[in-house]
Regions:
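N-terminal structural segment of carbohydrate-active enzymes
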Residues: 1-128, 136-153
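Single conserved hydrophobic/aromatic residue that forms the stacking wall/gate
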Residues: 155-165
Length: 165
């Protein structure tokens, strides 16, 4: 018998969900190894997840983190390769707490709108959203390009970073 108020959480890395590339090139780029997108969570996909009895989806790795992918064309600072874990980076090496991982968007400038759309689709499918981060676990080159003007934020610097520049 199913309990009335039991939470069932479905944890997922959006970068893996919907990624149809079966290759696994060591230190490969997102072109070589693929990457899932927010848009892969279609209403049909979300309804299938809901059918599992899911009440909440825990989207892991959605906050912008350090990566070796070059997004300077979108005014996103480049990370030094020596301080990035692999090419994709660790989703817990937060680069900007106020922004979304550009890898997960179909259109990088619209990444926040795409994430908001994902949240809306999830709610429309009858589930709640969880995202996570580790406080103070930041990338060596933390810099917010998306924070509100009134938010004071110091760039994260370290002795290692000064040697890399």
């Amino acid at each position: 018998m199913k309990q009335a108020n039991k939470m069932v959480i479905y944890q997922v890395f959006p970068r893996w969900f919907g990624n149809m590339k079966s290759s696994l090139v060591k230190n490969g780029s997102k072109v070589e190894n693929g990457v899932g997108k927010f848009s892969d969570f279609t209403p049909v996909a979300l309804s299938k997840i809901k059918e599992l009895g899911t009440t909440h989806i825990w989207y892991t790795g959605v906050i912008e983190h350090a990566t070796n992918t070059d997004y300077t064309a979108y005014q996103i600072r480049r990370d030094h390769a020596a301080v990035v874990k692999g090419n994709a980076g660790s989703p817990y090496a937060i680069k900007d707490y106020y922004d979304i991982d550009p890898d997960l968007a179909d259109n990088v400038p619209d990444r926040m709108k795409e994430f908001e759309s994902l949240v809306r689709r999830t709610h429309e499918a009858g589930m709640k959203v969880i995202i996570d981060f580790v406080p103070n676990h930041v990338a060596r080159q933390y810099y917010s390009d998306a924070k509100m003007a009134y938010v004071r934020s110091e760039e994260h610097t370290s002795e290692l970073q000064s040697h890399l520049m």
